[in-house]
């Protein structure tokens, strides 16, 4: 059984949001969206960044505590010599953990290389579908067509205000406003650990050059990420396993993605 794909067309916009021309998109934007593969590969890539952790084997055990025995009218928990203070047992203050974290725990999920490639293709295809982008919660003007492809000169934008103006002109700045309004303080101890605020996911800009000025210009805009087409993965395209991120492509980045992934569809 063969999968028959039909190529889509897309309009290319300039910095000011004006239509420049229409181009035919590669097959990677016509692939069926496989949520199951996207989820599997996202979890595989996400868990590869996790660090094993354990506990000191002697934690909670550095004490002289022993049980005084039975028939003394008191609990049989271990007690410190010359003190009588309960220690060592899991139900005591400063006692050991019953089941401490182990470095032997298997944290990393696995996925095949072919699955990883298909997941990226599938996630790219979701970014070209207005239904998926809307369902993910992104906000944009009704006139916006997907996928959003722009001319290569947008990579020369040097300031955050220029990038914001560009996003306004192509009709997706409302999504940045949505992210700004939803920045909130995290519940729990994460506040003490350098991650005080929670921020939603906003637009993704895929470029063809990692050293272009827009990479630094956009990094302080709420929710916006800039990624090289050579490095883009399911982590960027489907954060939290949810496909359909609002994505903006440069014209050359489309060609790079086609060279990188189209062989997977042929084979």
Curated annotation (Swiss-Prot):
This protein's record includes keyword rRNA-binding: yes
Keywords: Ribonucleoprotein, Ribosomal protein, RNA-binding, rRNA-binding
Superkingdom of the organism of origin: Archaea
Listed GO biological process terms: translation
Keyword RNA-binding attached: yes
One GO CC term, this protein: ribosome
Pfam families assigned to the protein according to its UniProt record, in alphabetical order: Ribosomal_L4
Family annotation (InterPro entries): Ribosomal_uL4 (IPR002136), Ribosomal_uL4_dom_sf (IPR023574), Ribosomal_uL4_euk/arc_CS (IPR013000), Ribosomal_uL4_euk/arch (IPR045240), Ribosomall_uL4-arc (IPR019970)
GO molecular-function term, one example from the UniProt record: structural constituent of ribosome
Cited NCBIfam families: rpl4p_arch (TIGR03672)
Subunit structure and binding partners: Part of the 50S ribosomal subunit.
Function: One of the primary rRNA binding proteins, this protein initially binds near the 5'-end of the 23S rRNA. It is important during the early stages of 50S assembly. It makes multiple contacts with different domains of the 23S rRNA in the assembled 50S subunit and ribosome. Forms part of the polypeptide exit tunnel.
Matching PANTHER family: 60S RIBOSOMAL PROTEIN L4 (PTHR19431)
Family note: Belongs to the universal ribosomal protein uL4 family.
The protein, known as: Large ribosomal subunit protein uL4
């Amino acid at each position: 059984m063969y999968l028959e794909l039909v190529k889509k067309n897309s309009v290319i916009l300039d910095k000011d949001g004006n239509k420049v021309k229409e181009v035919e998109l590669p097959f990677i934007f016509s692939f069926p969206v496989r949520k199951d593969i996207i989820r599997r590969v996202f979890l595989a890539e996400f868990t590869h960044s996790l660090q094993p952790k354990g506990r000191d084997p002697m934690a909670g055990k550095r004490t002289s505590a022993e049980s005084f025995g039975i028939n003394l009218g008191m609990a049989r928990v271990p007690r410190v010599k010359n003190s009588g203070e309960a220690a060592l047992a899991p139900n005591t203050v400063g006692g050991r953990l019953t089941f401490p974290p182990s470095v032997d725990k298997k944290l990393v999920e696995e996925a095949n290389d072919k699955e990883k490639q298909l997941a990226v293709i599938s996630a790219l295809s979701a970014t070209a579908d207005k239904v998926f982008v809307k369902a993910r919660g992104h906000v944009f003007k009704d006139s916006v067509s997907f996928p959003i492809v722009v001319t290569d000169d947008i990579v020369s934008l040097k300031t955050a205000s220029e990038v914001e103006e560009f996003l306004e002109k192509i009709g997706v700045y409302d999504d940045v406003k949505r992210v700004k309004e939803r920045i909130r303080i995290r519940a729990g101890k994460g506040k003490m650990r350098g991650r005080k605020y929670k921020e939603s996911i906003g637009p993704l800009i895929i470029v063809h050059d990692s050293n272009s000025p827009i990479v630094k210009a956009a990094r302080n805009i709420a929710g916006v990420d800039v990624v090289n087409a050579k490095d883009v993965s399911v982590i960027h395209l489907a954060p939290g396993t949810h496909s359909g991120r609002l994505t903006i492509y440069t014209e050359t980045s489309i060609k790079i993605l086609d060279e990188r992934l189209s062989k997977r569809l042929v084979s």
